[in-house]
């Protein structure tokens, strides 16, 4: 064999070897290995906000304090018995050393108008037990007794209420009594009441009181009375319902501050002068939880799956993973 022929044969052998390697590594014909980044997620799609019949309403994220929805949330309104939310949290904080002591029962307390639990000076009861009578069945007499026991005097407690409201950030409110009976100097806003409620729900003892469906309120004599919570979300089993207070007067209309928690996410709704308060708050709770789910899904997608290598076959135009191509050719 001539040297020229031998060189030609070797060149052909080397050439075919190189071509084979190229074919193998490019997926039989002209493929490219690309670093493919997943497309950005679509913006979250939120449901439509349901209308409510309330004159003033707010839906708050109980974890962050953010306002999710509102309707005239800063409108000046009468709070009615939702006032007792503030009365209760002050009693738990400032009167914690008096919780086991006898509550002060005066003629002023026993003479309150509206809903009462029937306090009597000859039937002593502890401050702790009285809080259930105030929050579950909305005893106006109980609220005054709580105020006089904790504040040292009626006026002293009213001062405590206004100072506490300001410290919480409820700066558009002014309180003139501990139970919410109508007074021109006793007013708030739905947003302020949501702020106060969020603050109160941060106290475990407060949460324990307002989530009770029925509580055996005991007098010192050993006699007890079952007091039932007027919160229909608790009795009807709305998912996650855990508080907090109803209210109603002629001036305020039907009022409700309610809370619900799912998977660690707390929502607080406050509606004032709303004849359909239960239906409206339920609709807003459903809306709020749906919005949170949509946002959480979006955040998860934003975090994204890690980018992966993709093999693009230039002949077929089809895309496959590098792992699939490796298995196919090796």
Residue positions per predicted region:
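N-terminal Lys/Arg-rich, disordered targeting/topogenic segments
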Residues: 1-14
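Catalytic-site microenvironment of enzymes
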Residues: 12-15, 25, 61, 68, ...
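Hydrophobic membrane-insertion alpha-helices, especially the h-region
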Residues: 17-30
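A structural signal for alpha-helix termini and helix-coil/disorder junctions
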Residues: 21, 152, 167, 290-294
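Structural signature of transmembrane alpha-helix termini at the membrane-water interface
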Residues: 28-36, 288
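Active-site-adjacent loops and short helices of periplasmic peptidoglycan-processing enzymes
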Residues: 34-191, 195-204
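Domain-terminus/edge residues, biased toward the C-terminal soluble/receptor-binding domains
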Residues: 170-171, 182-192, 197-330
């Amino acid at each position: 064999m001539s040297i020229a022929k031998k060189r030609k044969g070797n060149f052909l052998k080397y050439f075919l070897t190189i071509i084979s390697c190229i074919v193998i590594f490019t997926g039989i014909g002209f493929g490219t290995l690309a670093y493919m980044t997943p497309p950005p997620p679509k913006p979250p799609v939120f449901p439509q906000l349901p209308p409510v019949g309330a004159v003033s309403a707010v839906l708050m994220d109980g974890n962050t304090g953010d306002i999710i929805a509102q309707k005239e949330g800063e409108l000046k309104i009468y709070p009615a018995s939702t006032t007792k939310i503030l009365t209760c949290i002050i009693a738990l904080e400032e009167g914690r050393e008096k919780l086991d002591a006898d509550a002060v029962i005066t003629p002023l307390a026993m003479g309150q108008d509206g809903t009462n639990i029937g306090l009597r000076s000859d039937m002593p009861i502890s401050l702790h037990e009285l809080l259930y009578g105030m929050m579950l069945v909305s005893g106006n007499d109980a609220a005054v007794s709580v105020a006089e026991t904790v504040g040292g005097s009626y006026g002293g407690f009213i001062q405590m209420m206004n100072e506490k409201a300001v410290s919480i950030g409820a700066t558009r409110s002014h309180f003139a009594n501990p139970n919410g009976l109508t007074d021109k100097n006793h007013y708030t806003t739905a947003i302020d009441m949501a702020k106060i409620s969020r603050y109160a729900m941060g106290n475990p003892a407060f949460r324990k009181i307002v989530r009770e469906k029925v509580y055996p309120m005991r007098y010192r004599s050993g006699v007890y009375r079952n007091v039932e919570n007027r919160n229909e979300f608790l009795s009807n089993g709305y998912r996650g319902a855990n508080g907090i207070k109803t209210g109603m007067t002629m001036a305020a209309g039907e009022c409700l501050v309610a809370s619900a928690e799912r998977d660690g996410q707390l929502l607080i709704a406050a509606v004032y002068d709303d004849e359909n308060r239960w239906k409206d708050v339920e609709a807003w709770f459903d809306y709020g939880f749906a919005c949170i789910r949509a946002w959480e899904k979006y955040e998860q997608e934003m975090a994204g799956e890690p980018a992966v290598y993709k093999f693009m076959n230039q002949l077929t135009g089809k895309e496959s993973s590098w792992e699939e191509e490796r298995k196919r050719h090796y």
